[in-house]
From Swiss-Prot:
InterPro entries: RsmH, SAM-dep_MeTrfase_MraW_recog, SAM-dependent_MTases_sf. This is Ribosomal RNA small subunit methyltransferase H. The keyword S-adenosyl-L-methionine applies. S-adenosyl-L-methionine binds at G42, G43, H44, D59, F96, D108, Q115. It comes from Gemmatimonas aurantiaca (strain DSM 14586 / JCM 11422 / NBRC 100505 / T-27). Belongs to the methyltransferase superfamily. RsmH family. It is found in: Cytoplasm.
Length: 315
């Protein structure tokens, strides 16, 4: 990942370009109320607010929320925009009622450009950056604590599952060996361990893949997404759309499978012998295949390269 170009002046100041914005606007064109579960810099939300849509923006990162509130203060003061500090996987804990419903719900998963560009947050493998990677204050451990305490077998499984790393066992063994001499504290420590296993020709793509795997574990991202999907589905109004942008194959697989299951003619549990759902699907998948960014957008915003957008409509 690299910093992306600033937004044009027509988008409320200088901010990073939101990914797949035109596609999101098209899919949620009929929405009058939107829940932005990953508010970040507020780029997607700003576009909805400019159209007169009422938006509730959620983010687990206090800094991101504060920046978005400053950017969108005019809309917040008018009552059109509401900002909530929360993890989208635990909205009830933030005071959301089970009756809160939305015409559109958006998730833009992964790290925001603001988080990545701030080296002090520890999401980057820049020289000297701390091993933090926490998206919010609700994470139990930062990346350094995780790498310094996790069992070697569990670390190997983590790297295999989240980074598709064929040398996961060897890399886990190298990390454990190094931390016994000196605890991991900065990005350099992890980069050196990766190079020791993958060789001197390893580079940014390898580092990004391993760092992403550690970040996913620190923030419990895949488990959180899996828990959140049915809960967010149930917050849609009839005909409402759930749109999700993912950047990791594990995320995309969870979303694809959930949308497929919800669109099936029978949604009863597999071990239930008698159908009680009356053979009616919960809704339909709008995107038969994931939507990717155009080459033009990728040229303007490199973060869009790995983005995959899927959308589902409630019955």
């Amino acid at each position: 990942m690299t910093p992306v170009r600033s937004a044009p002046s027509g988008r409320t100041g200088t901010y990073h370009v939101p990914v797949l914005l035109s596609e999101i606007e098209t899919m949620l064109a009929n929405a009058t109320t939107v829940l932005d579960c990953t508010l970040g810099g507020g780029g997607h939300t700003a576009a909805f607010l400019e159209r007169g849509v009422r938006v509730t923006g959620v983010d687990r990162d206090p800094r991101a929320l504060a920046a978005a509130r400053e950017r969108l203060g005019e809309y917040e003061r008018s009552g059109q925009f509401r900002a909530v500090l929360a993890n989208y996987a635990a909205l009830e804990e933030a005071g959301f009622s089970t009756d809160d419903r939305f015409d559109g719900i958006l998730l833009d998963l992964g790290v925001s450009s603001h988080q990545f560009d701030d080296a002090s947050r520890g999401f980057t493998f820049r020289e000297g950056a701390p091993l933090d990677m926490r998206m919010g204050t609700d994470a139990d451990l930062d990346a350094g604590e995780l790498l310094n305490t996790i069992d070697e077998v569990d670390l190997s499984a983590l790297l295999r599952a989240y980074a598709d790393e064929p040398r996961a066992a060897r890399m886990a063994r190298e990390i454990v060996r190094r931390r016994e001499r000196r605890p991991f504290a900065t990005a350099d420590d992890l980069v050196d361990a990766i190079r020791a296993v993958l060789g001197p020709r390893s580079g940014a793509p390898d580092f990004a893949r391993i760092f992403q795997a550690v970040r996913i574990a620190v923030n419990d991202e895949l488990s959180g997404l899996e828990r959140a999907l049915p809960a967010l589905r149930d917050r849609l109004t009839p005909g409402g759309v759930l749109a999700i942008i993912s950047y990791h194959s594990g995320e995309d697989r969870l979303v694809k499978n959930a949308f497929r299951d919800w669109s099936a003619s029978c949604v009863c549990p597999p071990r239930q012998f008698v159908c009680t759902c009356r053979g009616r699907p919960l809704g339909d998948t709008i995107t038969r295949k994931p939507v990717s960014a155009t080459e033009q957008e990728i040229d303007q915003n490199t973060r869009a390269r790995s983005a995959r957008l899927r959308a589902w409509r409630s019955a």
